[in-house]
Amino acid sequence: TAQEAHVEALRVDSETAKRKAEEAVKAARAAREAASAAKAELDKLAADQTAQAAAVQNELAGQKQREAEMQAESDRLTAVLRERAEAARRAAAAAAAAAGGGGGTPQGGDGYMLWPLPGGWVTSEYGSRVDPINGVGGFHPGLDIANPCGNPVIAALSGTVVSAGAAGGYGNRVVLDHGIQRGVPVATSYNHMQSIAVWGGQVSRGQVIGYEGTTGWSNGCHLHFEVFVNGGTVNPRGWL
């Protein structure tokens, strides 16, 4: 009958509306879940970026602190060596005056140094360079000489051990005072060593004073070798 047909049509419309409503609810739920997942992903990305930025800042702060510590140690050593250099000049002048030399400074040996890491090769020269660790430009006050870790490091000249031990960013270090050489007070330092073989007293030219390593602020096995004249660094090439 017409009434039954009308009722059936209403039922179909109701079921269709219900199904569409359920589908709309499911779609809304899926959209909420997708939005929640997207927000979680964005939150995670933001947290990761914040953590990475903090890590970079911490690394930069650490590098600046290491640089400051190494500069302070360099300044301290320079002051010590300048004081020793002045004492050596006074002693040489007094000795020359006593010998009737009119106060001149004597020549101390031939002045040429042995290669401090036999068989090693230079990987970084004295002077301006970009630091291989932090990529920042600066001044390199010595020669970097490379060889496999564990190779012997020798005294470039005979001298007196000024200091031996850990020296912050310089790693395990030995500093030698060679007195007057070629008319000027000379000292040398040997840095980043794996281990040290002398702790005080006198050493002879060519004597093993330690073994090459990569201690301190270093990016690989090498010897950082410095030559000091009158307490300040000079290019070791002029002495080797």
What does each of the following model-derived ranges do?
Residues 1-106:
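Alpha-helical oligomerization segments with coiled-coil/rod-like character
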Residues 107-240:
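Catalytic cores of peptidoglycan-degrading enzymes
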